[in-house]
Amino acid sequence: MALPTIAIVGRPNVGKSTLFNRIAGERISIVEDVEGVTRDRIYATGEWLNRKFSLIDTGGIDDVDAPFMEQIKHQAEIAMDEADVIVFVVSGKEGVTDADEYVSRILYKTNKPVILVVNKVDNPEMRNDIYDFYSLGLGDPYPVSSVHGIGTGDVLDAIIENLPAQEAEENPDIIKFSLIGRPNVGKSSLINAILGEERVIASPVAGTTRDAIDTHFTDPEGQEFTMIDTAGMRKSGKVYENTEKYSVMRAMRAIERSDVILMVINAEEGIREYDKRIAGFAHEAGKGMIIVVNKWDTLEKDNHTMKQWEDDIRDQFQYLSYAPIIFVSALTKQRLHKLPEMIKAISESQNTRIPSAVLNDVIMDAIAINPTPTDKGKRLKIFYATQVATKPPTFVVFVNEEELMHFSYMRFLENQIRKAFVFEGTPIHLIARKRK
């Protein structure tokens, strides 16, 4: 089920990112200190009054080299295209500016809810100055101090009031997957080839989300799939649409709704920073992953080429050691028949549940191989572990002191669990918790 999207827009230096961090709070988390996992905070999940939503700081997407007004226009266009609710941030210290008026004229035409936030209202006396912002024609201004957290609750209330009705839960038996990657890596050709390979009638499912084109199909064994594609990857006519920074947001929307991600790399161009950035988002979201090297037919190859590629991918995507790699050609259909089976296998791994007794046998065996660490004379004690979730498989390890569970030992336990059970293509999460 797609989460509704909130876009934060506004000219530079009005405090968009501060408001973003204040709303997102601790939900922005970097779970691993691994090189290559993105530290970009333009996208997060927020929650208020039991409603979850996606939050986008459009300033983080912007092209800093573009002319000033072009940047602002770009932000507003993204907001118009993507958001269910737009949060327009202005500065109470500077008052209404020409740039604010420029953005307001664009937003006024969107026919989408716009919440006008006057930020940097850091003392009560400044509240008297917010009335000038009524001139923007966007309704009541909300005075806020993002730095001090004053007024953000009122903004969140307004966001929730303007969100669309919640969608019905999707069928959990249907495997949802998407192809993501840089523009021109061959996603569209792969999509068409996969659908053709299945020899089924594929039908677009309209209205599932505002901007997605979902294609539903069934394989010969009766497994149902939903392939999530975005309108932005297919439609034309917008100058910014094919820029990598715009496609980042499209990819993140697809990642959010998918169970399994097919990360497509162009064999002709190799691995780029964009690939690592998007893969990091999918990894942190706990999604299943297949690394698909497309256009494999275009390369001059010898007996070592595939191994060299695999080594390079493992080196540059160290945090994706669990993800299988497949070399394909959408043009010649090389190895495409393997993809649906790989997706099914990963979905099965994502939904695996390990009985507590079996899991704890593995944990005890791991401790026998590599005793728990000590810190300042105090040894980590592991009492027991249990699985608390699937998609991704998540385990809580109950210990005497959480601080004694070093990252390296947590990684060791994860590796031992992976050796004992089949978790192909899916991350697994381990959480240390003090036993009460």
UniProtKB/Swiss-Prot annotation:
GTP 1 binds at residues 10-17, 57-61, 119-122. Residues 352-436 form the KH-like domain. One of its GO terms (molecular function) is GTP binding. Residues 4-167, 175-351 form the EngA-type G domain. The keyword Nucleotide-binding applies. The keyword GTP-binding applies. Keywords: GTP-binding, Nucleotide-binding, Repeat, Ribosome biogenesis. GTP 2 binds at residues 181-188, 229-233, 294-297. Pfam families: KH_dom-like, MMR_HSR1. Gene3D superfamilies: 3.30.300.20, P-loop containing nucleotide triphosphate hydrolases (3.40.50.300). One of its GO terms (biological process) is ribosome biogenesis. InterPro entries: G_ENGA (IPR031166), GTP-bd (IPR006073), GTPase_Der (IPR016484), KH_dom-like (IPR032859), KH_dom-like_a/b (IPR015946), P-loop_NTPase (IPR027417), Small_GTP-bd (IPR005225). Belongs to the TRAFAC class TrmE-Era-EngA-EngB-Septin-like GTPase superfamily. EngA (Der) GTPase family. NCBIfam families: GTPase_EngA, small_GTP. PANTHER family: GTPASE DER (PTHR43834:SF6). GTPase that plays an essential role in the late steps of ribosome biogenesis. Associates with the 50S ribosomal subunit. This is GTPase Der. It comes from Streptococcus suis (strain 05ZYH33). The lineage of its organism: Bacteria, Bacillati, Bacillota, Bacilli, Lactobacillales.
